[in-house]
Amino acid sequence: MARVKTGVVRRRRHKKVLKLARGFYSGRRKHFRKAKEQLERSLVYAYRDRRRKKRDFRRLWIVRINAACRLNDLSYSRFINGLKKAGIELDRKILADLAMNDAAAFAKIAEAAKKAL
């Protein structure tokens, strides 16, 4: 049986890795072994940070809501409790957007939360 060389398969595999390594610095873009190692790390970071992004945004929204609540003489926890008692079902993303872009509307919501307490 004739010996099979991996020329075509290797070329495809290397091209696939080097294509994904575009944008990396120096040898991590040009050399297959370095590119492959960096690509593995990069994919791990990407997987981890897709989950972390959800936590980070939630924290950011809470900070923004808390800052707006304090301008309306209310703490964040009391504000959220008041919203639940008032039956206002707005998520934190929407509340944070209102706090940043429409302070008057947020003040009305804060008043409704205060009354429900």
Curated annotation (Swiss-Prot):
Biological process per Gene Ontology, one example term: translation
Any Pfam family matching the protein: Ribosomal_L20
Residues spanning the signal sequence: none
MF annotations from Gene Ontology: rRNA binding; structural constituent of ribosome
SUPFAM superfamilies in UniProt: Ribosomal protein L20
Sorted UniProt keywords: Ribonucleoprotein, Ribosomal protein, RNA-binding, rRNA-binding
PROSITE patterns, A to Z: RIBOSOMAL_L20
InterPro entries: Ribosomal_bL20, RIBOSOMAL_L20_CS, Ribosomal_protein_bL20_C
GO CC annotations, alphabetized: ribonucleoprotein complex; ribosome
Record-linked CDD domains: Ribosomal_L20
Residue ranges that the Swiss-Prot or TrEMBL entry lists as coiled coil: none
Keyword rRNA-binding: yes
Family to which this protein belongs: Belongs to the bacterial ribosomal protein bL20 family.
PANTHER family, sorted: 39S RIBOSOMAL PROTEIN L20
Purpose: Binds directly to 23S ribosomal RNA and is necessary for the in vitro assembly process of the 50S ribosomal subunit. It is not involved in the protein synthesizing functions of that subunit.
Protein name, as recorded: Large ribosomal subunit protein bL20
Organism: Campylobacter jejuni subsp. jejuni serotype O:2 (strain ATCC 700819 / NCTC 11168)
